[in-house]
Amino acid sequence: MNRVAVIGLTGTSVFMRVPRFHTGGETIHAESLHIEYGGKGFNQAVAAARWQAEVSFLTAVGEADAVPVRDTLAAEGIDHAVIAKSGPSAYAAILTDPSGETRVTVYPGARLAPEDVDAFAPMIAEADILLLTNEVDEAVNTRAAGLAAANGTRVLLNPAPARPLPATFKRLVWLATPNEFENEGLEDIPEAVITLGAKGCLIRSSGKRLPAPSFGPAVDTTGAGDTFNGVLAACLARGMDLEAAAVEANAAAARSVTVPYVLQSIPIMG
């Protein structure tokens, strides 16, 4: 118990604070610049590890980033399978306005292939929760979810970015965590926690809304969803029921938005 396997994207995140967002054809100057490793899979693995789960993480990066990414994950206590690919890693450009709202553009970069999942099969089999996102290819997620189903590992899907999902894959998912805009088409997944940003989240089966606490003004919402999912996975792997796990994930995400950027904003349990 308490094991989480994560499969997802790792890349370089470039943060720029701007006085306001662009209008059409406009160039504006950023007020600050910050660069760190990120990606939904990477951030969620870190969040689960900081919430005291035993985390295994499968990802792909460009060859130039393989060693520093492995070192960063090792420093977080994450058992990693970082596959080096030719070409660049993923990149994300993140603009943040004074209210903490963001605009994000992602270049997908190095991609996992379905066959990369096979060497990760023992980690999936040993996990209590397999955490997936739509940042990796559908065939990769389907291969991983099939291995999870064969070994009794529950699949948690963060369905971002939104895309249509085949019924064959959705049948393998136990729990999804869409936001209000990603929820369409996921009704046949057995359970969902619908994230509502500053308003908290909603457990679909019970209709119960769980408000998010406040730990101060929001300065940066980037990565709040990743924190929510990583902490939710860690709590579920520990044996907590869904409502209790969602309450804890809500609080962790609410705390994260009071700190700028992502890695330094992901809280440590305790």
Regions from the language model: what does each represent?
Residues M1-T10, R70-A84, I94-R209:
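Ribokinase/PfkB-type carbohydrate-kinase core domain
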Residues E184-G270:
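Conserved phosphate-binding/catalytic region of the ribokinase-like
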Residues M1-L58, P68, A218:
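Glycine-rich phosphate/adenosyl-contacting loop at the front of the ribokinase-like
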Residues A49-R50, A149, A237:
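Gly/Ala-rich phosphate-binding loop of Rossmann-like dinucleotide-binding domains
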Residues V61-E63, P161:
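Residues in the short beta-alpha loop(s) of Rossmann-like NAD(P)-binding domains
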